[in-house]
Structures are given as structure tokens and as C-alpha cells.
């Protein structure tokens, strides 16, 4: 099912969303959740609480979208078998497990990630991500790419680092670094560059 065909749901609080998650089949396509912005007339579950509920049930948050001035939406889906884990979500899960909030489906996702190495390979949040030595070396060998990398906005910088981190083998990592450095050397970026103000 395409993401624009998913239902848009509103939950008042965490127990309501948890009850919905518990009733979903393993092959659920997911849903968009509607969240109130500050000052909205209708309160909803907070995005942070919804993420906790989702992780506890083996689901994960994804794409964001605007609804109007009072509400925004986020897509929630069951976690795919090989999907990457973030360090932030790993820490959330550890807190939820300590509180006894992890469901059997959530535990199965965690156990599988630990068994196949995705748990240990969790990626750093954007605020803490930094280039590894192999990427630094490749950038140093290509001054134009280094200059473009130094000027990237935070979204483009993180997009480069994330793609390198997601390479599964040393050969795949080397290939990905070469592709990204060549892209930067051409003055290209993953996301369109934002116009500078001023």
C-alpha cells in the first residue's frame, strides 16, 4: 500500500495507541498518526510517546508530513526485517525494557537485531555523527570534494555519513565512499542545497 493510501489516525494518549498496535496483524501496512502542535484545540498523544509505543510493539516511526497550522503527521509501520537501528531508538528500547513495556513482537525485533548485528551497528544521531577515518582519507585525497563536504548543510552532511555507515561490507563501504566523494567532487549533493540567507 502506498504511503498516501494509509489511514490518518488520531489517538488521545499512549494507552489508546498501544491498544491499536496490539490489535494489528504482523503484515499491517501501517498508518499515519496525527499530532497536535502547541496550542492546538484538540490534544493528541505526543510524538515522543508514540515512538515509545511503536518501539515497544516492534514498529518504527518514519516520514513526517504537514497537515495544517495546528497538526502534523508521522508515518508508523512495522519494522522491516533488515531495517537499521538508531542509537537513539536503542536507548529508548533499553529504557522501555527496564520498565517492562516491551511486547512479545517488540522483543522478537530486538532479539533479531542483536542476533544479526544490527543492534551493535546502530547509527549515531545527526548531532553526534562524524566521518570515520576512511571517509576522511578519501576526502583529503580529493580537495574539491573536501571543500564541498565542508560547506554542506546538516541534512546533506548526515546523508553522506549515514550512507557510508549503512554499507554492510568493507568492499561495499569502499565503493560507497568512492561514489560519494566523486559526487561531492562534481559539486553535487544528495538533497537539494538550500539557498543561503543574507
Per-region residue spans from a language model:
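Charge-dense, helix-prone N-terminal extensions
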Residues: 1-198
Amino acid at each position: 500500500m502506498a504511503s498516501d493510501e494509509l489511514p490518518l489516525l488520531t489517538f488521545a494518549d499512549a494507552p489508546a495507541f498501544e491498544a491499536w498496535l496490539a490489535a494489528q496483524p504482523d503484515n499491517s501496512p501501517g498508518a499515519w498518526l496525527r499530532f497536535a502542535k502547541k496550542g492546538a484545540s484538540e490534544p493528541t498523544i505526543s510524538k515522543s510517546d508514540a515512538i515509545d509505543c511503536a518501539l515497544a510493539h516492534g514498529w518504527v516511526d518514519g516520514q513526517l508530513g504537514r497537515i495544517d497550522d495546528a497538526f502534523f503527521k508521522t508515518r508508523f509501520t512495522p519494522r522491516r526485517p533488515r531495517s537499521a537501528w538508531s542509537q537513539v531508538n536503542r536507548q529508548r528500547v533499553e529504557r522501555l525494557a527496564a520498565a517492562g513495556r516491551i511486547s512479545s513482537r517488540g522483543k522478537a525485533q530486538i532479539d533479531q537485531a542483536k542476533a544479526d548485528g544490527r543492534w551493535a551497528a546502530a547509527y549515531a544521531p545527526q548531532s553526534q555523527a562524524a566521518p570515520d577515518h576512511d571517509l576522511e582519507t578519501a576526502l583529503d585525497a580529493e580537495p574539491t570534494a573536501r571543500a564541498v563536504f565542508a560547506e554542506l548543510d546538516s541534512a546533506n552532511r548526515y546523508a553522506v555519513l549515514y550512507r557510508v555507515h549503512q554499507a554492510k561490507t568493507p568492499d561495499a563501504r569502499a565503493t560507497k565512499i568512492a561514489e560519494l566523494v566523486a559526487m561531492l567532487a562534481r559539486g553535487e549533493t544528495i538533497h537539494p542545497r538550500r539557498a543561503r540567507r543574507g
